[in-house]
Amino acid sequence: MRTLVILPTYNEILNIETMLRTLREVIPSVDVLVVDDASPDGTEKRAQALSEELGQIHVLSRPVKSGLGGAYRAGFTWGLEHDFELFVEIDCDFSHDPRALPSMLVAAITHEVVIGSRYIRGGVIPRWSLSRKLLSRGGNQYANVMLGLRVADSTSGYRVYSKSALEKIHYQSVTADGYGFQIEMTHRARRGGATIIEVPISFTDRAHGESKMSRAIVLEALWLVTKWAVERPLQLRNP
């Protein structure tokens, strides 16, 4: 199946070249779409140069920084317009190991949504403090209980979606960003009847650049989970 790796970027000049070369080495056949939010550090220009050298690399430029969710929505739309069938979400900072992608694509043969999970057997998070692990797992468990997601890692940003999954999710109307975006996509996939599987991954904090996550994004996710949980019984009574 034609596969598109969607790579949102903002100020990733220290990572973009290594990431694109690694993706090309690991899975030479995939196309990569760099969705850049007007990075002032030259990320877009470097991606354009690498697209000419490596091939099958495309650059979608957005005029302003508009968030992770917006970048993925734009990437999904671009990919569907260009007849791709599988869509990969991955961070550019190597917190998601590109070498785990082949096993995720194998799982995508039989499932519509594949989540790279830190919290199933085999998943690891090296160098995280105990308090950070407890906070992350607690947030995931809260979303799971409140929304009935039946996944261990609903905030993971390392994923594969099929075209059919995106159609069931109606991704164009997803409004959340950051962690909330991943939870909302999972929630809609489950409600839409998409088949979901988790595969273990190793999650490593970025070595270069600054994290794009903020306190506001975390609080947004907690608020949205609570809001969706309140709405869920009404939706069940009024399908």
Please report, for each region that a protein language model flagged, where it lies by residue.
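A conserved acidic beta->alpha catalytic loop
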Residues: D36-K45, V64, F94
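Acidic helix N-cap motif at the loop->helix transition within catalytic regions
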Residues: E17-T18, D41-L50
